[in-house]
Amino acid sequence: MKECKHLHSTQLSTDSFTHMQWGEKLSDGRLFTLMAVGKPDGIYNAGPCSQFVFGRISEDDGKTWEKPYFLYEWPDHDTSYLLLGWKIDRDGRLHVFAEATTDAPHDNPKKLEGHIAYVRFDSYRGENPLYSDIAALYRYTGSLNNIIETEAGRLVVPFSTFMGDNFVSGTIWSDDHGVSWKASNDVSVSSEETSAESGAVEPVVAEVQPGVLVMLIRTVLFRLWYAVSYDSGESWSKAKPTNLPSCNAPANLLKLPDGRILLAWNDGLGHPMADVRYSLARQCLHAAVSSDGLRSIHGARIIVKKVVGDQDRIHNAYPTASNYSENEVLLWHFEVFGKCGSSWKALQGYLVRMNPAFLEETEVKDNWAEWISDSEKTSAGIVLKNTNEIAHAITNFPYAKKGSIKLAVSGILPQGTSILLSDCYLDRLNFIPENKNGAYKDVVGEPYTRLSPNAAGEWLIEWDETEIRLSVDGKQIQTCRKNTDGFNHITVLFEKDGELRIGHFHAKAEIPDWDTGIRY
């Protein structure tokens, strides 16, 4: 079976990250993106260097791209400019933002100095550039992951900025199309982490009601956090945790033409780990849709996954999205440590087109292409064997607070075979012997419910609001309490030698609403 990296979507393009920065459909139907030429070693290159922004156009829906055309040269050759993101507003103006770094010594990762660089053009063609250092928020910034234009026409741009020990989040906004900018209060998140990437990092925002915005924040606390603004981004509430698991990675929000909100994020926990509580489980990207202003979501399905040949520590991360049509969106993300050889110095970017309708589905059957495993996968199922210290296979299904799963399993059950139900992706790295006891388990515990079948056969797993029941060949053998409100992943694993064949899979959600914990 051919491995598919992108699920429920059509891959349009792949290119170097610096050659394809987000994607948007122009009013004439063509696709537009930006590319950048920066310093060869980024923020660590102290020598003067010319740095440029170029535009690119696709006439064939992203399959091929025309030669880049010049848009702008950044003003200071000593500063390092990293293109962060851009937006074309309703009047056609192009707004471009960059991270302008003036000092980032190798020997002091917490000495980060710089500011936000901004340039506005009359259109994507680059007329009449207007440059600003955004004096209202003159601090070093990290990544930019979305930009919105509110119903009233205000531009709101979420940033996290460095405050000496970690990051705080906030927004800048403009009511005059980018001529001038103001900044909100800072939103902070406290943790015991000592990494410079802790705090309230890389926020994204969405307008959930006229003038009411919700901010989602990357943290090291195994959850996305959120804050609310009731004045279109001028001020923000204190941050609180959501119910959505997340490794230390940013999310993305996009309001669809019908008013629903699309959420994309790394719904993963655990290894690879760094520092005290720093999960980099970015192997898979997930998507969900909300019809009630992010109070609840549906779906929580994998849309980008780890494939055979990728490193276990692969990053499929940093999603950004824009509307392509009434029914489809453009989704961009980058990859690090993939089988193509991508790395932090050679990020691989991808642009796909996706119809979010599948996120409203409530059941899946025999979705073998969506399973993640080193074992053999065919159109008839999974042949699960111990490969590289563990037999491990995991798949994703529509989130269910109440639901059921049926599996047809054949073979002699290896000793210690387990079924894990979770509301997050759990990579095989979490279960190999050297990682089973470590900082991750000490900090977060076991983010799953473990079931123990006593034989191969017809496995039936049912759960309601409080408990889970496991039956084998019609006989109930285990009942236990849920440790999370619902599930959207199932893992089958064992450590001993042996072989199991999974020949049928059927998951059904009876209560598909995932309460995010967001309140306003």
Model-identified regions with their sequence ranges:
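Low-complexity, Ser/Thr/Pro/Gly-rich disordered linker/stalk regions
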Residues: 354-401
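Flexible glycan-contacting loops in extracellular carbohydrate-active proteins
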Residues: 480-506
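Beta-strand-rich interaction surfaces with strong enrichment in secreted/lumenal proteins
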Residues: 73, 84, 240, 392-398, ...
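Asp-box/BNR beta-propeller blade signature and adjacent active/binding-site loops
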Residues: 1-363, 374-375, 493
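Short tryptophan-centered beta-strand motifs in secreted/extracellular beta-sheet-rich domains
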Residues: 407-409, 455-472
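Extended recognition patches within non-cytosolic domains
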Residues: 507-520
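Secretory/extracellular carbohydrate-interaction modules
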Residues: 385-442
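Short, aromatic/His-centered strand-loop micro-motif at the edge of beta-sheets
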Residues: 440-458
